[in-house]
Amino acid sequence: MSESRRWTRRDAIGAALAGAAFTAMPLRAAATTLRWASVLPANHPAVVMMERVAKQVRDETGGAVDIQTFPAGQLGSSRDLIEATSSGAIQIVDEGAAQFGQFVPQFSILEAPYLWRDAQHMRRACTSPVIDEMSAMLVAKRQMRIIGVTYYGNRHVTSGTKAINRVDDMKGFKLRIPEVDTFRAMAEAWGARPTPLNFGELYLALSQGVVDGQENPLPTIQSAKFFEVQKYLVLTGHIITPRLIAINEGAWASLDAKQRASLKGALDTHGLAQDNEILAQEGKLVDTFKAGGMTVVTPDVESFRKPVLASVPAKFEAKWGKGLWERIAAY
């Protein structure tokens, strides 16, 4: 994205939000407005969580803190939203952990392939001093702090062109990935052709054959309706994604102690409920997709793991910091 285009998008976001704020001002002149944006569809559990957090905070503060939610990429791509939160054009964003690696490289390890043993392992590490340390670096570098971590799910590959049983079947496969270097390295280790695309462009790209497939957790495949344009679900389970909730530091500073406690408490309550909903959906959706006509493939997972673990951790150790992989793995 060129610098001029990025400023054009940012200006457009700012103008739209300024208009919304001006319109609302007569009703809530004294309220602190926090705009929370996400690329996820309105029916995704993470967006349901956003709405519940907004309501609880509004109720507990008597309307003094008004969280406005903007799902479904209304305000831009993942990168756009993080940059807008950093600048203060919006105040809260939730995104996959590795997306923050563009500012603090250590964040990308949190979506490293085959790092997490399960959701519980991820939760233990992501509520540890590791996250506090990364958050402090994010505040210093880009004026954002992490105020919540949720479970986004275990990621699997889907294909619109062929069944994938072993990693050899990925050779030349056009795999959509987020704009994240660790995802690119993983796809390359598989022999695939990594193709970065914004999430909002993915459904159309799959339907038109611009890419052969993608990878995401089951609830995202469901909520974004990727099952409509993909024939095969391949249970690779290659990455467990923690989704980070970040707030602009100036916005955080504008809240008093009780308001901060209300926001954190609501995030803890509804974040846990969201995690449980994601886990429940993961337990049912394979059968749902199968009943809907998708072919479900249980691949040779070790053939996917081996080339990735042989190359990716060593490639990124200097970026992450020596010993960080082992420190996280020990939780």
Question: What are these model-derived regions, one by one?
Answer:
Residues 2-7, 13-22, 30-121, 129-331:
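N-terminal secretory/targeting leader peptides
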